[in-house]
């Protein structure tokens, strides 16, 4: 029986006889003494075997190779001074193996080197195809253990300190297409009818509040059939919470305590409280988006009033058509950013135009306080306007001002993108900083120009601000998102709990009373039976762990992720199914495979 994990052994175990299990990470033959690095999920420890000291294990050690699975029994010994290894936690000790038992070998050539001693860069598609080998590597193994620690900390806080109940909600539910596409599951028992996999437990957790389960949480699996990005998966995990009889301030306070608990337990980091807050409007005005990275400056400054009446047509046309002009001050930008990068063909120009802008205007501030720019701008700015512009942007000699002009949404999107790119390129972002903040007071709705109707910005169960009930189309939502270093890690809201308000919201997004009853009648009916005030939040577990692990993709904190084409390279899912299975489900496929034509 195993007595210890490899990575847990220290000098405090000297003289103990231990039994370890693991994989051979590396084998070295040093003139009659064979050294093995034995690896398990906790780390690596050195095993030694020689014909003189450990004659029983030596013949087995001679035949071992990388990734063989073995059992080792031996005595923990102190390493000689010349072989100490400060790079690993077990570097002061080694195990002289009285016994080595080969449990399994490797019968195929390894697709890549698993050993932590090799720095081989492996293509992600190969890693995903052989994910069971990839997960043996220290980085991925540590990420999954970190994920476990985060979930454990969540559970302990919510259950032991805050009296929450963990309650499971259905995976097979009904389709309520609002937002992302559902994954559909045909019913064999009810031909022609379909289940949907849940995009979130939203409706069920609200019904649990109606049922009196006043503090609910769940580590929930969610499914969305949407176009994928680096931080999206078709199936993902969230910490889902709902609370009755709590206002927004109480919910935010509890969640700040939860996040602080997670960081303290998992990373031994004390986060300052309370977390800063910005309204949605403030965030858009200063950063151009609703998930700002506040670890650095380069904030947007609105200069529409100052520059909208100049003779420079790009600026005046933007303001006269209802748009805006905004600027970013880049300290020392005269030295760090050339004109070539700003003009057509440059990398910054490309970033801006990919975000929808037609180009970038710029002004360079010289040592004498004068400006240097393209003639059309300079010719249309008088001395007083230049002075006011420098005051508004706090620009100094040597600084560069970058401008966006046009419809406000495009200006915000393009300058927000430039801001992030410049923050990275200029080294303004502290990779170890942790900046958390709440974004509040979102709009209830946004206009879908394609479908010519309003859509809920979050979801249609979010409660409108009580001061804005007169005209819901312009109402603020009692919604809140938690943002960490420019990534939204959680979002929630107070919920509607009165039938008449919920019906009014459904009508605003274009649902007729009949459609609302057909899709959500069970919820509306529940509101007739004494529904308490309630609210909640959901955290993207994958994103949170990604940030804690300092990874760039959530695929590196998920055991078996899908690709950006929503496929599993390991199991080759999705895959075709037998026609007999489809017939049992009363389903027929209309897909016609494309015929490959040889050149």
From Swiss-Prot:
NCBIfam families: aspS_bact (TIGR00459), PRK00476.1 (NF001750). GO terms for cellular component: cytoplasm. It is an enzyme of class 6 (ligase). InterPro entries: Aa-tRNA-synt_II, aa-tRNA-synth_II, aa-tRNA-synth_II/BPL/LPL, Asp-tRNA-ligase_1, Asp-tRNA-ligase_1_N, Asp/Asn-tRNA-synth_IIb, AspRS_core, GAD-like_sf. One of its GO terms (molecular function) is aspartate-tRNA ligase activity. This is Aspartate--tRNA(Asp/Asn) ligase. PROSITE patterns: AA_TRNA_LIGASE_II (PS50862).
């Amino acid at each position: 029986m195993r007595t210890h994990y490899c990575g847990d052994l220290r000098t405090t175990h000297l003289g103990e006889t231990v039994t370890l299990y693991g994989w051979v990470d590396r084998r070295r033959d040093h003139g009659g003494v064979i050294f093995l690095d034995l690896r398990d999920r906790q780390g690596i420890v050195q095993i030694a075997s020689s014909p003189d000291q450990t004659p029983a294990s030596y013949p087995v050690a001679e035949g071992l190779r990388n990734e063989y699975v073995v059992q080792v029994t031996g005595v923990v010994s102190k390493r000689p001074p010349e072989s100490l290894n400060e790079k690993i936690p077990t570097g002061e000790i080694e195990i002289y193996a009285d016994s080595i038992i080969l449990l399994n070998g490797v019968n195929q050539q390894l697709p890549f080197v698993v050993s932590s001693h090799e720095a081989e860069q492996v293509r992600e598609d190969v890693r995903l195809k052989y994910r069971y080998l990839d997960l043996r590597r220290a980085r991925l193994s540590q990420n999954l253990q970190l994920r476990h620690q985060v979930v454990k900390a969540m559970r302990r806080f919510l259950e032991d300190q805050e009296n929450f109940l963990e309650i499971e909600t259905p995976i097979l539910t009904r389709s309520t297409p609002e937002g992302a596409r559902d994954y559909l599951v045909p019913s064999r028992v009810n031909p022609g009818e379909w289940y949907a996999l849940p995009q979130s437990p939203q409706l069920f957790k609200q019904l649990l509040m109606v049922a009196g389960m006043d503090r609910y949480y769940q580590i929930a699996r969610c499914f969305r059939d949407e176009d994928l990005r680096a931080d999206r998966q078709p199936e993902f995990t969230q910490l889902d919470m709902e609370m009755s009889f709590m206002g927004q301030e109480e919910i935010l306070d509890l969640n700040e305590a939860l996040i602080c608990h997670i960081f303290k337990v998992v990373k031994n980091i004390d986060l300052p409280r309370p977390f800063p807050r910005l309204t949605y409007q403030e965030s858009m005005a200063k950063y151009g988006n609703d998930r700002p990275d506040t670890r650095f400056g380069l904030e947007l400054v609105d200069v529409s009033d100052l520059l909208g009446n100049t003779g420079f047509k790009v600026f005046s046309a933007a303001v006269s058509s209802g748009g805006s002009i905004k600027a970013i001050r880049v300290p020392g930008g005269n030295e760090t950013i050339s004109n070539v990068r700003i003009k057509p063909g440059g990398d910054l120009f490309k970033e801006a135009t990919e975000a929808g802008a037609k180009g970038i205007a710029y002004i360079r501030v010289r040592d004498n306080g004068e400006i240097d720019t393209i003639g059309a701008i300079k010719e249309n700015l008088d001395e007083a306007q230049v002075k006011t512009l420098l005051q508004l942007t706090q620009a100094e000699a040597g600084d560069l001002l970058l401008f966006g002009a046009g419809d406000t949404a495009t200006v915000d999107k393009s300058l927000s993108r430039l801001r992030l790119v410049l923050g990275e390129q200029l080294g303004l972002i502290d990779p170890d900083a942790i900046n958390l903040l709440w974004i509040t007071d979102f709009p209830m709705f946004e206009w879908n120009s394609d479908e010519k109707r309003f859509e809920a910005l979050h979801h249609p169960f979010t409660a409108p601000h009580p001061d804005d009930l007169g005209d819901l189309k312009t109402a603020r939502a009692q919604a809140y998102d938690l943002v960490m270093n420019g990534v939204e890690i959680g979002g929630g809201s107070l919920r509607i709990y009165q039938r008449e308000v919920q019906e009014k919201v459904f009508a605003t997004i274009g649902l007729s009373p009949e459609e609302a009853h057909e899709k959500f009648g069970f919820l509306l009916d529940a509101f007739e039976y004494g529904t308490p005030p309630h609210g909640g939040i959901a955290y993207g577990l994958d994103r949170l762990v990604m940030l804690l692990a300092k990874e760039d993709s959530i695929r590196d904190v998920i055991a078996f992720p899908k690709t950006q084409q929503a496929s599993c390279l390991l199991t080759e899912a999705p895959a075709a199914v037998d026609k007999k299975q489809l017939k049992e489900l009363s389903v027929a496929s209309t897909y016609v495979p494309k015929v490959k034509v040889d050149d």
